[in-house]
């Protein structure tokens, strides 16, 4: 795994992440079908810090005030859990509405809650961890039938932990547009003007961005 990570870093640093996934992960993507390409990728390099209720980024010696947020897309039912990824993403937004990706979790096989006494954590355990680190203004969770156990577990865990700081909000995905159309309408404009920035270490996220579209 370490050698594979080194090869992934080499291809990402050379501006050819898709080549890594094509050669080593057997994933092929048509560039013509992709919504985004490497020109849409903008990086940021710095630190996220909090001081009480105040959050800011330290970039090139400057402190940039930001509002942190958490987004959660759970795959928690028994059928989806092993095939689909559960995702938690932490972002920060500055006064110019620029989005900085702080960190993310992308993992298959996540239960709603981990079993006490065992190392494996559930998605709710990770939500509390991310909430403690980034202190998001709000945690948005996609509101589906499958996510309802997540909300129930957050409520019960807040009581058990005596920690009521998670500000969870349900967000319905909507049915008027497909996910691809929603991304094209909302995210493509942000990427086009450089209003979304990720870190160079976000290999999997970069891959998801530049290969979003139909597979060959």
Language-model features: where?
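ATPase catalytic-site recognition across NTP-hydrolyzing enzymes
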Residues: 1-75
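Active-site-proximal structural scaffolding
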Residues: 13, 17, 81-84, 147
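An active-site-proximal beta-strand-loop segment
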Residues: 72-88
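Mg2+-dependent endonuclease catalytic cores in nucleic-acid-processing enzymes, primarily RNase H-like
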Residues: 1-10, 27-31, 35, 94-215
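Short, conserved, surface-exposed binding loops centered on an aromatic residue
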Residues: 56-64, 78-82, 129-133
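Hydrophobic alpha-helical segments and helix-packing faces
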Residues: 68, 81-84, 116, 120
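Structured core elements
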Residues: 70-71, 90, 140
